Amino acid sequence: MKKQAITVISTALTCFLLSNVGHAQEKPKQYYTVLLKDPSKFEQGITEIKKENGEITYTVPEIGLIQFKGDTQISKNQSPLFESVNPSLQVEKPEVPHSIKMPNLSTLSTKTLDTNLPPLWDMQWDMKEITHNGESYKKETGSHNVVVGIIDSGVDVDHPDLVKNLIPGSKNFVPKGGLRGTEPEETGDINNINDINGHGTLVSGSIAANGELKGVAPDTGIRAYRVFGNKSADAAWVINAIIEAAKDDVDVINLSLGSYYVNGKVYENGKLVDNGWAEVEGYKRAIEYANQHGSVVVASAGNDSVNVANKQELNNFLKQKYEKEGKIFTGVGIEAPGELPGVVTVSSTGPTGQRSVFSNYGEGVIDISAPGGDYRLWQQYGEEVWWNTGLFRQEEVLTTFNTGRYLFAAGTSMAVPKVSATLALIINHYNFKNQPKRSISHLYKNGIKKDIAPDKASLGNGQLDVYNAIK
């Protein structure tokens, strides 16, 4: 069972705005998040915040979440409407490790004999493994009747491998001015889903590429829900995107992101930072909302090689992270949204079938694993040999990238979309639309390798097998 009683303070992957001691006129206004006890009292909550001179900056009325800017933090005790109040949390923008622009395809030496498979197929060790060398495509490739919503940095709308499956209805959640007004290039246009970062395009290719590359579900519809510009995102944007994707009748919601939180207290410069769990409770409410509206939510386990089920190990990891930031904490850490109820949590494996060296793990946390690449060869031979001899092609996964390019990358972010795409195939193949529990149960029972007894801490219910999921 996944942990459900959560208090959020801060995280190594999440930025935290802390209030400072001093006179109000001597410090800039800070951003705070309020979660209401009863979302139906949303307008009353807005009124209460404005009474305290709070400037409303972002809202998610469906779950009673409000972000405001103010001189001082409002205590949750100031109103019986407030469940929690804390400095607003940010989710750091996802990192894109490096891009490799592939050579002209006509110069590639390829052994691909099946004319139904694309020219770069021989470089897709991950897809060959989970599709039984493309056999799953003969059974099911998906349709636009089933949609995967990708909450990320947007998508390259002109990428030739993706354009056929990018269906209408994508949305931008980065507001005008971007993060706290620091991105003047962000206009707040709801239709701006252009991927500046590139991470969302990487994820999209693993799901629905259908060109020089092939994704798991090459005829499945995708929508981009853009929450990252050039900088980090407020967690409220991600929460809002989950809600909106569910309202848009998205079948599978892909979250190739995650952060660390603490159930306890955090101190900075000897000062106690008030406890708060608005964003984590907001995530929980949004995920429950999505499940109730028929959407499956899939999230990554994280990339720090930590046993997140072992709270002592996780706490030691977070302690080291916090010390670098001049902070100390007491309490218990958690990875979210991966550890939250109602989420399919994915770890990463490499070409050997072992858990990737970077992947988080933990029995009772990991639900399933999928190929996301590895760095064992990099560790064995060193970076120079790994690059110069092309060893990276043997363990990183190839996917789509911005401006029509392709990229070799690794991370749990590359494992999650394969599971999301497989769920989309299951929903389409078995007509499981609006039946998230049934779809997930089928995945865990059938969509895994049958000949391998899984290490539950690393692989959960097992290693993803797309062919088995739909045969």
Label each residue range with its predicted role:
Residues 1-5:
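Positively charged n-region of N-terminal signal peptides that target proteins for export
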Residues 18-28:
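Sec-dependent signal peptide cleavage junction
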Residues 24, 32-122, 351-354, 361:
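Autoinhibitory propeptides
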Residues 33, 67, 147-151, 205, ...:
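Structural recognition of the beta-strand scaffold that forms the well-ordered cores
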Residues 114-206, 210-218, 237-240, 247-248, ...:
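Active-site core segment of subtilase-fold serine proteases
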Residues 138-143, 214, 233-255, 277-300, ...:
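Mature extracellular/periplasmic domains of secretome proteins
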Residues 250-257, 261, 428-471:
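C-terminal subdomain of the subtilisin-like protease fold in secreted/lumenal serine endopeptidases
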Residues 322-424:
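Extracellular S/T/G-rich loop segment that most often corresponds to the catalytic His/Ser-adjacent loop
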